[in-house]
Amino acid sequence: KASYIFNYRYSTTGLLNLEGGTMDYQDLNLKLNFPTRKAGTFSVWGTSLIDKFTSDFEKNTEKWDYWGDRSESRDKQYMAAGGVSHRYFFNNDASLKTTIAATYSQLDGGATLFNHSMESTPYMDLDSKYTNLIFTTTFNRKFSNRFTNKTGFTYTNMFYKMDLSIAPYEAEPLEIVSQGKGNTSLISAYNSSSVGLTERWTLNAGIYGQLLTLNNKWSVEPRVGLKWQATPKATFALAYGMYSRMEKMDVYFVKTKSTGNQSVNKDLDFTKAQHIMLSFGYKISDRMNLKIEPYIQFLHDVPVMADSSYSVLNRSDFYVEDALVNKGRGRNVGIDITFERFLEKGLYYMISGSWFDSRYRGGDGVWYNTKFNRNYVINGLIGKEWMLGRNKQNILSVNLKLTLQGGDRYSPIDLEATMNHPDKEVQYDETKAFSKQYSPMLIGNYTVSYRINKRKVPHEFAVKGLNFTGAKEHYGHEYNVKTGRIDVSDNSTILTNVSYKLEF
């Protein structure tokens, strides 16, 4: 029997006037299933979103304290993905799943500065488009209760077009930072097996390989894991794996003033990592689980800037404007602990904590904290459901999530360099990269929903509150033109989203 799911969402933030700008978000998701008697099951799926944000400049020049007060910006993001999948089950405990898909993303952004005469000059302009055509297939075969093998292949053809220009200083012409147009391919394949050595020991082993045709860089990555069922309630596991990744497409096409039209990063290799992880799981009861997972990760061949603390491991901006080399390293050490109680009598809860240390070595050979080295993240989640209605068919649900995490990392301010900058743009002492840290953050979210389960058309009302604790996000620092001081740039965004959903 064929089935389908269709979901459209429009965020109520589009109806709000946020301070200094507007935000608009909407998305669409669908999936159609068509089972057949002899030819397997066909599925058609799709997802898309539109995300827009505009920031207005302050019209009253007497209120211009910071550079951002006289800046007007736009940020429009469009994304879509869709495909057709086919799954076929053979008579010998084997299955084949094949998918043909396409993805598309576009980012249109820009910033304009105004002077006291209300004359505007462009400061940044960005237009990037990415399209991926994907073919992937996976063959799974269960040879016995103790031996299963999976083989997969993926071919991704990536089309790209990007144009990014930035003015080096205010009122100067825009200069090309990153530009490229063309296509390349990423080819990957893997084979993995799960072998039950005994009733208590299970071995998982496999190998993964990939090739980037842009520069013919390739990698072969072994992965292995061993699991021991020590008792009916306790399990231990040890796993090792090698992983690699390509960079975002814009990195490969950076152009600098010294190289002219030549893209300086086209020959970058994959960033590679070695993972080692232990795992202990304990089933306290049918409804309660405890899991403890210490791990260590070593990264190498990380793209960095020569003789600098810069590394792509800290990248948060949407562009890179420098020549890079694969000489960086990284190291992550930590432990994850999770305790969860599954839903019973309408109640569930989970407590998890992560303690970690994340460091990297830049192109100058010095080890630093990574930008994301918060050191700890603690999550608490609790929810309660009540069955209501004449036949107890409706559900009132209340959920609460609290997150306590270490503050963002940042580099010390280089006051002299900042004051000497023509635009007083804040400069940082990169020889002490990310050595400072903001205060811890407490983030709270909640959801209250009421689901009415009608026979033909179930529907649901929901109210979601994001960051009701008022935690502040930090965006760096800004020079105050009135006081002559450098202030922290932060913002606390508290959102309440009301939604209504129909299922048919």
What is each residue range found by the language model?
Residues 144-148, 154, 177-299, 352, ...:
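Structural signature of Gram-negative outer-membrane beta-barrels, strongest in the C-terminal barrel
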Residues 59, 106, 164-168, 213, ...:
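Surface-exposed extracellular loop regions of Gram-negative outer-membrane beta-barrel proteins
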Residues 33-51, 72-215, 229, 284, ...:
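Face-selective signature of the C-terminal outer-membrane beta-barrel domain
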Residues 6-12, 44-50, 98-104, 151-157, ...:
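Transmembrane beta-barrel strands of outer-membrane/channel proteins
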Residues 296-298, 319, 323-407:
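Gram-negative outer-membrane beta-barrel transporters
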Residues 132-136, 177-190, 265, 269, ...:
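Outer membrane beta-barrel strand-and-loop segments of large Gram-negative receptors
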Residues 403-425, 439-445, 450-504:
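C-terminal beta-signal and adjacent terminal beta-strands/loops
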Residues 1-35, 43-47:
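Predominantly transmembrane beta-strands of Gram-negative outer membrane beta-barrel pores used
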